[in-house]
Amino acid sequence: MVDIRRKTNLRIYLGIIGNPVSHSLSPAMHNKLLKKYKIDGVYLPFEVEKGNFPDAIRGLRALKFRGVNITLPFKEEAVKICDWLDDQARSIGSVNTILFEEEKIKGFNTDAFGFEKSIEKKGYNLSSSSVAILGGGGTARTICFVCAKNNAGKITIFNRTKEKAEKIKSDIQSIFPSSNIAVEEFGKINFDELDIIVNATSLGWKGENLFEVIGCTPKPNREKTKKLFYDTVYIQTPFIKIASKMGYDTEDGKWMLVLQGAKSFQIWLGLYPEEKLMFKTIKEEIAKRHKRKCSTL
């Protein structure tokens, strides 16, 4: 991939499309990178109404944007508008990164990369692990794909609506036939049998206690068992706080956000950026927003 700084002197336009997008940390993260690498560019947020997504993408292409990130609720719809998909986007059925190149709209899924590498950074190995995925949406599908790809020993999807979870199971097993995937209801979780527990829902953003929703809480980890509670939400949710208090390893979604963003940046600009700078930037942005919120109370 060519480093675009050597390819053109034109200003680079990037962005993120979703609804809502006001909470997104991606503009702060990517604009910091553009400044760091002395790239004349800007990363902008675009809140798009449902039904207007295809027009928004075509409009950004007409405006000569280099690429955009796609967030909720448009990741699945983005698959349909792309002329080309990478293997992960095609398999998962979800696009979070678009590149406008050679009159084509190219779709990528870097969320899978972000989750996989963040687990590795934490010192855990998905291979042969027993993994619980809480949720049945697009994020759960991505997590399940990564676990199956890495030969997890057992994957159990826990969701209120079993039909959605069964669909994920069926789709992923069609790609990885030997994967061991089960579907259960929330109340049947036995934390003692699990190595990695992933919250793939948005519960926790507003302070909801996911353990209350699923009807069970992990016991104190007196044996110091190696077990990871992982939240795809990038703030300290009750899920993370309670698991940590009980003595377990925890990881929120900050590194997943950073790593998927780093991969997107590389796709657009041919340059893999400095991960630590990205992590520092989003931590500072979260702290700044928290301070601003507290000052208005």
Regions found by a protein language model. Give the residues of each.
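Short acidic low-complexity segments
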Residues: 176-194
